C-alpha cells in the first residue's frame, strides 16, 4: 500500500498530456511507442522492490518485456547524444529531441547507432536484449524532461 501511495504521489508531479490515445503504432504527445507492437509492462515507473538488489528503490522508466532481437524504435526524432555501455543499463542509447526532452533505451545487445547520428521517429535504433542488470530480455525506456525523468506512459500509449 505504501508503494502504491508513493507512486500515486509521484505521478501527480509529472507533467501529463491531455487524453490522446492510439494504437501501438501511434503517437501520444509527439512520442511514438518504442516497439513495433504492444507488449507487457514487466516493471512500472516509480518506487518498487528492485528485482536484483531486493531493495526499495526508484525505477526511472518503464520496462517492456519483449523477445530478444525485437526492433527498438526512436520514440521521436532527434540526435543521439549517448551510445554506450554501463553496468546497470548494459548497452544503451540516449536521444535528444530538443525542447528539453530526451529518451533512453537500455539493455540492448549492442549499440546500433552512434553519437551524433540524427534519427527519425519510428527508425530502428537498436534491438531488445538483456545486458547490464537484467533478469531477461526487455526494453528499459525512460523519457526525461529538462533533465528529470517523467513517466513515459504519460507520453506514449500501449492501446
Can you say where each PLM-predicted feature lies in the sequence?
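Catalytic cores of peptidoglycan-degrading enzymes
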Residues: 27-159
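Alpha-helical oligomerization segments with coiled-coil/rod-like character
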Residues: 1-29
Amino acid at each position: 500500500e505504501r508503494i502504491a501511495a508513493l507512486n500515486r504521489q509521484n505521478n501527480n508531479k509529472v507533467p501529463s498530456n491531455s487524453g490522446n490515445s492510439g494504437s501501438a503504432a501511434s503517437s501520444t504527445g509527439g512520442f511514438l511507442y518504442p516497439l513495433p507492437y504492444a507488449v507487457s509492462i514487466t516493471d512500472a515507473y516509480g518506487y518498487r522492490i528492485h528485482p536484483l538488489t531486493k531493495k526499495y528503490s526508484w525505477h526511472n522508466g518503464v520496462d517492456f518485456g519483449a523477445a530478444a532481437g525485437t526492433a527498438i524504435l526512436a520514440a521521436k526524432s532527434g540526435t543521439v547524444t549517448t551510445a554506450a555501455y554501463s553496468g546497470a543499463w548494459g548497452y544503451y542509447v540516449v536521444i535528444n529531441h530538443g525542447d528539453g526532452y530526451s529518451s533512453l533505451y537500455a539493455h540492448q545487445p549492442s549499440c546500433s547507432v552512434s553519437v551524433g547520428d540524427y534519427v527519425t521517429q519510428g527508425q530502428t535504433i537498436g534491438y531488445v536484449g538483456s545486458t547490464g542488470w537484467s533478469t531477461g530480455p526487455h526494453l528499459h525506456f525512460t523519457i526525461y524532461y529538462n533533465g528529470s525523468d517523467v513517466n513515459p506512459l504519460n507520453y506514449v500509449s500501449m492501446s
